[in-house]
Each structure stands twice: as C-alpha cells, then as structure tokens.
Amino acid sequence: MVNINELPENILLELFTHVPAPQLLRNCRLVCSLWRDLIDVMTLWKRKSLREGFVTKDRDEPVDDWKIFYILCSLQRNLLRNPCAEENLRSWRIDSNGGDEWKVESLPGDHGTSFPDTKVKKYFVTSYGMCLKSQMVDLKAEGYSEKLLDTVRPDIVVKDWFAPRADCGCTYHLRVQLASADYIVLASFEPPPVTIEQWNDASWQEISHTFSNYPPGVRHILFQHGGKDTQFWKGWYGPRVTNSSIIVSHRTAKNPAPARTLPEEDTSNRRKILSFGSWEDLSP
C-alpha cells in the first residue's frame, strides 16, 4: 500500500488545492513537516487563487504573499448590511431622525434620476431636519483575525452614493472611523459636508476612500452618513443615499497614502465611541 507522502510533491500540491483553506491551515498543516512545508509554499495559494477565480493567469500586478491574498479574497464582501434599503431600515442605527424622519423610496423617485447600477432599486432619503444613520462593523466577528489586521493591515475601502432632488438643495454628511477593541479612534475619514444647490441635475455621486497604512489595533469600523435639505421643506427633500459599502481588500496601491491618524501624544484628540451619535473626551 502506497503511503500518501510517497506521492510526488506536485501531486500533493494538486490535492491540497481542493482542500478548503481552514482545513489546510488548522488540520493538514499539523500532520507532518512535509505537509507543513508544502502548505506554506506560495505556489499552492496561487493555484487556489486561480482555481477559485480570485485572479487570472494574465495578471500583471505582483503579489507579495499569495496565502494572504487568498485569505483576503475569501473573506472579501460588503461588510455593511442592507446597504440598498431592500429591508427598509433594518441593520441601521438611527442617530438623528429630524424633520419627517428617515424614509425608504424606490428609484428614481420624484425629481430624481436612475442609479448607475440597475440592480439597485431603492434608496434611503432624509428630511428637513438632520437625519443620520450608522453601522458598527466588528472585524473579528466578520472573520478577520487580530494577526491579519495588525501585521498585514489590508486596505479598507469605503464607498457611498448620494444624490439630491432636482427641485431642492441639500447637504450630505459622511463619517468613517477605524477604532480599537475599546473603541479608541485610530484613523478617520470625515470630508467636509457636500452642499448642492436647488435646480441641479439630481445625478448620483460616488464618494470613496481607502484606508491604508493605518495603525495596528483596528477592530471596529464606524460608518455614518446622512444629511438634510437646505430649504426646510416638509417631507423628504434631503439627500438620498444607497449602495454604501465597506470592503477589506488586498493592498493594490504601490505607494498608498497613509490613513489620517490621531497622534498618541495629543490626548485631546483621543476619543471613544460611546454611541453612534455622541463622543466623550477621554483626557483627564
């Protein structure tokens, strides 16, 4: 009877390409030194990436670590739940519910335009008082280990889409923060509010930001957006938002700009997320 370890290494590698990654790393790698060494070979993880469609053979961009690349591709998905209002306001925390409060409408809506992606059918709409909603993403609960987050520090790509009504001006707000296990803010993206005047083209606009080279210790992501109309009209005339996303991805930028971080020596900037809508100073 032939021992499996007597098979040529290329045959063993081919067998391993069909074994799920968790079993390879948690079980197979512990069997013997031969299996451990083969499972650590980058060729195996490149083959698995090709087999599962994470990459094509004609890829020009180099990959530093195929195992990390494969793991990140396996986990990659939108970490925000109900981004397109298909489940009304489910999964969102309402931080501010001004005017006539948040509402869900179907595209294109009154005095609106179609969304670029035809699969998106609905949007959230704000009113004449400030409307803000948010989600908190727990990265460990989503499958990202502390070691992966702290040593690899993969890119965190945040995107949001917003649009005004053609007949009413509005102001749109976005805030995204990376926080530690105890909710200390380590990096943030909070662009100036976008104000759009009345009698506009009602077009959908995308806003995007990539967190790269952020400090170690990131465990949570706070995503908050919303706004209000600028004319204080009763009803739902404020900015419309939909198709929001947070995706953790393999770093692709060759020289990515570092994330905006809060310096440790500046204790006045060390803030803790107490709730999705309020902040507390942690300095003595």
Curated annotation (Swiss-Prot):
Pathway: Protein modification; protein ubiquitination. The keyword DNA damage applies. GO terms for cellular component: cytoplasm; endoplasmic reticulum quality control compartment; SCF ubiquitin ligase complex. Residues 69-250 form the FBA domain. One of its GO terms (molecular function) is carbohydrate binding. It holds the Pfam family F-box-like. InterPro entries: F-box-assoc_dom, F-box-like_dom_sf, F-box_dom, F-box_only, Galactose-bd-like_sf. The modification Phosphoserine is found at residues 249, 268, 275, 278, 283. One of its GO terms (biological process) is DNA repair. It is found in: Cytoplasm. SUPFAM superfamilies: F-box domain (SSF81383), Galactose-binding domain-like (SSF49785). Keywords: Cytoplasm, DNA damage, DNA repair, Phosphoprotein, Ubl conjugation pathway, Unfolded protein response. Residues 1-48 form the F-box domain. CDD domains: F-box_FBXO6-like. It comes from the Eukaryota. Substrate-recognition component of some SCF (SKP1-CUL1-F-box protein)-type E3 ubiquitin ligase complexes. Involved in endoplasmic reticulum-associated degradation pathway (ERAD) for misfolded lumenal proteins by recognizing and binding sugar chains on unfolded glycoproteins that are retrotranslocated into the cytosol and promoting their ubiquitination and subsequent degradation. Able to recognize and bind denatured glycoproteins, which are modified with not only high-mannose but also complex-type oligosaccharides. Also recognizes sulfated glycans. Part of a SCF (SKP1-cullin-F-box) protein ligase complex. Interacts with VCP, CHEK1 and CUL1. This is F-box only protein 6. It comes from Rattus norvegicus.
